[in-house]
Amino acid sequence: ELFFIQLNILRTSNLRKLKLRGIVFPSVGDYFNTFYKEYLPFELTNAQKRVVREIRADMGSGRQMNRLLQGDVGSGKTLVALLSMLLAVDNHCQACMMAPTEILATQHYATVMGFLKDMDIKVALLTGSTKKKERNKILPAIASGEIQLVIGTHALIEETVVFSSLGLAIIDEQHRFGVEQRSRLWTKNAVVPHVLVMTATPIP
């Protein structure tokens, strides 16, 4: 009986590994290297460097990354998230960042655009307030892969949003989204994308 219990545990473990198989990001390419060497406005802290190395290792392992990025407001989480997104683009995938409010999504978009202003990367902002005319331009560009990075709110999980190849999904303040909302983001790709969750350090 114990043998069969162990066999069942092993089977469950193997099934879980199969389900968690992720997209392999084997290379660090021009987008990441160019930004890091030429456009990074300041030196990363040792903690940021360590986290970026760990994220690179996770996304190159063949297993789906599911990582929590925790830090105070202003600690540089968005920059680490951006470097992760550039790794996705270097490996011919798209990346998205979902925030719980339009204000926060707009702030992230402005920050990312500020960092990438001198680079040839297509970034879009998609929220509930995005005008229909603009939305009609953005959605086909996401579906074709022309838009590489998408930042938005719950609007990202609407059925009309179809990605060409979503490799990385970043969620800011995950606790403000429901389980169903988060899971709908995972289904935006045939293979479950890598997941990076950003959250502020809890106050003791």
Tell where the protein language model's regions lie, with residue ranges.
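Pre-Walker A segment
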Residues: 1-96
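Loop/turn-to-beta-strand initiation segments
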Residues: 92-96, 122, 145-149, 165-168, ...
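Conserved RecA-like ASCE P-loop NTPase motor core of nucleic-acid helicases/translocases
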Residues: 94-101, 126
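Conserved H-loop
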Residues: 100, 107, 128, 154, ...
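Conserved helix-turn-beta segment of the N-terminal RecA-like "Helicase ATP-binding" lobe
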Residues: 104-143
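Post-DEXD/H (motif II) to motif III coupling segment of the RecA-like Helicase ATP-binding lobe
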Residues: 106, 162-168, 174-204
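Conserved motor-coupling elements within RecA-like helicase/translocase cores
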Residues: 129-150, 157-166
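Walker B catalytic acidic pair
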Residues: 153-154, 172-173
